[in-house]
């Protein structure tokens, strides 16, 4: 049996036309990606020290996708994630100390210690949560986009449409909920961006072996929405694609499907020895580290100097050290509230 070919490197190059990024914008992107990477590295340390339990899925290598999309959104916009949700939450503005406390199972966690790694949630930040099963977040995100349309068209509220960014992996795109929600979003012109983080592997199944059409963005054509393929290792390329999608959604023109070609630098979870991917494949993708790529862009174009970038790195390190101290010192959930939040109050 022959399978379609795998994604070939290098991917498309970034075209800067129309982004209008200044120094402040670029440093925000750089800091956000650094925060995500260092947060995940700290999670690995804490997990192996026995401070975290259960499955922990890290996001190393995929930071350009989260940062490139979410940093374009307004605070009132929505984000829906997967079980690999820590960095999406950070990009949406959930404080790192509350995400870390959640991973420690503490009362000060953003889900009161009840969600853990796979169920990060924050209502104040319109972060709709992570989901342990693939595709389960897509209907929730579609519902969030629907209520935005409903508020404007039925309740006659005057605010701009709120955009929903829905993240999921390549393995999800063979699930029926993916197709059903694409269809519904187009029918109702919902303000939603479907972001496929195609990291080439669904646990141990290579994507090119599991789909008759591995080019996921091409599936959009069947439903009548734009499908964009983008280099998910380049935050500026992702931001450019996301900018088009956000504008389209906010002005009421409907959804967009973005396929970001990316790669996770660690195994599927911290329990995965990562023996199925070849060393050559991993090295080829690691050489395209999105953080190093943006750092080089900033330095080569003399947007900031190495001292300024080191200051950002040190600030991130300090923030995460404080986040761990906060998580360790925070109280455990009270046993008397064990059954709280299972049902709606009143």
UniProtKB/Swiss-Prot annotation:
<dbReference type="InterPro" id="IPR029061">
    <property type="entry name" value="THDP-binding"/>
</dbReference>
<feature type="binding site">
    <location>
        <position position="132"/>
    </location>
    <ligand>
        <name>pyruvate</name>
    </ligand>
</feature>
<dbReference type="InterPro" id="IPR017597">
    <property type="entry name" value="Pyrv_DH_E1_asu_subgrp-y"/>
</dbReference>
<keyword id="KW-0934">Plastid</keyword>
<keyword id="KW-0150">Chloroplast</keyword>
<feature type="binding site">
    <location>
        <position position="134"/>
    </location>
    <ligand>
        <name>pyruvate</name>
    </ligand>
</feature>
<comment type="subunit">
    <text>Heterodimer of an alpha and a beta chain.</text>
</comment>
<feature type="binding site">
    <location>
        <position position="170"/>
    </location>
    <ligand>
        <name>pyruvate</name>
    </ligand>
</feature>
<protein>
    <recommendedName>
        <fullName>Pyruvate dehydrogenase E1 component subunit alpha</fullName>
        <ecNumber>1.2.4.1</ecNumber>
    </recommendedName>
</protein>
<dbReference type="GO" id="GO:0006086">
    <property type="term" value="P:pyruvate decarboxylation to acetyl-CoA"/>
</dbReference>
<feature type="binding site">
    <location>
        <position position="83"/>
    </location>
    <ligand>
        <name>pyruvate</name>
    </ligand>
</feature>
<feature type="binding site">
    <location>
        <position position="268"/>
    </location>
    <ligand>
        <name>thiamine diphosphate</name>
    </ligand>
</feature>
<feature type="binding site">
    <location>
        <position position="134"/>
    </location>
    <ligand>
        <name>thiamine diphosphate</name>
    </ligand>
</feature>
<feature type="binding site">
    <location>
        <position position="84"/>
    </location>
    <ligand>
        <name>thiamine diphosphate</name>
    </ligand>
</feature>
<feature type="binding site">
    <location>
        <position position="199"/>
    </location>
    <ligand>
        <name>thiamine diphosphate</name>
    </ligand>
</feature>
<dbReference type="GO" id="GO:0046872">
    <property type="term" value="F:metal ion binding"/>
</dbReference>
<feature type="binding site">
    <location>
        <position position="199"/>
    </location>
    <ligand>
        <name>pyruvate</name>
    </ligand>
</feature>
<dbReference type="GO" id="GO:0004739">
    <property type="term" value="F:pyruvate dehydrogenase (acetyl-transferring) activity"/>
</dbReference>
<comment type="function">
    <text>The pyruvate dehydrogenase complex catalyzes the overall conversion of pyruvate to acetyl-CoA and CO(2). It contains multiple copies of three enzymatic components: pyruvate dehydrogenase (E1), dihydrolipoamide acetyltransferase (E2) and lipoamide dehydrogenase (E3).</text>
</comment>
<feature type="binding site">
    <location>
        <position position="170"/>
    </location>
    <ligand>
        <name>thiamine diphosphate</name>
    </ligand>
</feature>
<feature type="binding site">
    <location>
        <position position="171"/>
    </location>
    <ligand>
        <name>thiamine diphosphate</name>
    </ligand>
</feature>
<feature type="binding site">
    <location>
        <position position="57"/>
    </location>
    <ligand>
        <name>pyruvate</name>
    </ligand>
</feature>
<dbReference type="InterPro" id="IPR050642">
    <property type="entry name" value="PDH_E1_Alpha_Subunit"/>
</dbReference>
<feature type="binding site">
    <location>
        <position position="84"/>
    </location>
    <ligand>
        <name>pyruvate</name>
    </ligand>
</feature>
<dbReference type="InterPro" id="IPR001017">
    <property type="entry name" value="DH_E1"/>
</dbReference>
<keyword id="KW-0670">Pyruvate</keyword>
<keyword id="KW-0460">Magnesium</keyword>
<feature type="binding site">
    <location>
        <position position="132"/>
    </location>
    <ligand>
        <name>thiamine diphosphate</name>
    </ligand>
</feature>
<keyword id="KW-0479">Metal-binding</keyword>
<feature type="binding site">
    <location>
        <position position="83"/>
    </location>
    <ligand>
        <name>thiamine diphosphate</name>
    </ligand>
</feature>
<feature type="binding site">
    <location>
        <position position="199"/>
    </location>
    <ligand>
        <name>Mg(2+)</name>
    </ligand>
</feature>
<keyword id="KW-0560">Oxidoreductase</keyword>
<dbReference type="Pfam" id="PF00676">
    <property type="entry name" value="E1_dh"/>
</dbReference>
<keyword id="KW-0786">Thiamine pyrophosphate</keyword>
<dbReference type="GO" id="GO:0009507">
    <property type="term" value="C:chloroplast"/>
</dbReference>
<feature type="binding site">
    <location>
        <position position="171"/>
    </location>
    <ligand>
        <name>pyruvate</name>
    </ligand>
</feature>
<feature type="binding site">
    <location>
        <position position="170"/>
    </location>
    <ligand>
        <name>Mg(2+)</name>
    </ligand>
</feature>
């Amino acid at each position: 049996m022959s399978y379609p070919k795998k994604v070939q490197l290098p991917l498309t190059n970034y075209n800067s036309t129309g982004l209008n990024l200044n120094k402040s914008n670029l440093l925000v992107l750089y800091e956000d990606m650094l925060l995500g990477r260092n947060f995940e590295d700290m999670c690995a340390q804490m997990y192996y020290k026995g401070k975290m339990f259960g499955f922990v899925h890290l996001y190393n290598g995929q930071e350009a996708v989260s940062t490139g999309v979410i940093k374009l959104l307004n605070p009132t916009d929505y984000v829906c994630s997967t079980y690999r949700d820590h960095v999406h939450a950070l990009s949406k503005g959930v404080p790192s100390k509350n995400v870390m406390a959640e991973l420690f199972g503490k009362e000060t966690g953003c889900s009161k210690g009840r969600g853990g790694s796979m169920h990060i949630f924050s209502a104040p930040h319109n972060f709709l949560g992570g989901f342990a099963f693939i595709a389960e977040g897509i209907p929730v995100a579609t519902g969030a986009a629907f209520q935005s349309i409903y508020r404007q068209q039925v309740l006659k509220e005057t605010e701009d449409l709120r955009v929903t960014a829905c993240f999921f992996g390549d393995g999800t795109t063979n699930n029926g909920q993916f197709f059903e929600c694409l269809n519904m979003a187009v029918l109702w012109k919902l303000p939603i961006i479907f972001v496929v983080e195609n990291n080439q592997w669904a646990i141990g199944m290579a994507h090119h072996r599991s789909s008759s059409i591995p080019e996921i963005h091409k599936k959009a054509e069947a439903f009548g929405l734009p499908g964009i393929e983008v280099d998910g290792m380049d935050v500026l390329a992702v931001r450019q694609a996301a900018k088009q999608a956000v504008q389209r959604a906010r002005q009421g023109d409907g959804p967009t499907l973005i396929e970001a070609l990316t790669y996770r630098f660690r195994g599927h979870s911290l329990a995965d020895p990562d023996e199925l991917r070849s060393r050559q494949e991993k090295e080829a993708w690691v050489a395209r580290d999105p953080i190093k790529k943006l750092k080089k862009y900033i330095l080569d174009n003399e947007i900031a100097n190495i001292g300024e970038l080191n200051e950002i790195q040190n600030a991130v390190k300090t923030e995460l050290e404080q986040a761990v101290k906060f998580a360790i010192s925070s109280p455990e959930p009270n046993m008397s509230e064990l059954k709280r939040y299972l049902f709606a109050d009143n």
